[in-house]
Amino acid sequence: MDSLTFTTHCLSFDEVIELPHFEKKSFRVNKKIFATLNIQKKQATFKLSAIHQSVFCDFDPNSIKPATGAWGKQGWTIFDLTKLTDEMLIDALTLSYCNVAPKRLSEKYKA
């Protein structure tokens, strides 16, 4: 998935704003980051539950891994945008949004 497509998907969720976050783009709902995009490294980072993080990392440990240190223990998970299907990235993005967004916003995206 290219960076423009990723950004478009992030901004398609309700009440999302894009702001810089150090050398990355961040996508926020209710002032909380649910995803970041590192354009240079072609990586996205998502805020997942521990269970979802484990499932994704087990699926493809070469392309999906917990962030280092305490961030990874909090569910932040790094995805290689060049090696994964759009469908998988959109699934992770949706889970991340629902993990961070208030219930009134996230309910419509839950399966």
Tell me the role of every PLM-derived stretch.
Residues M1-A111:
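Charge-dense, helix-prone N-terminal extensions
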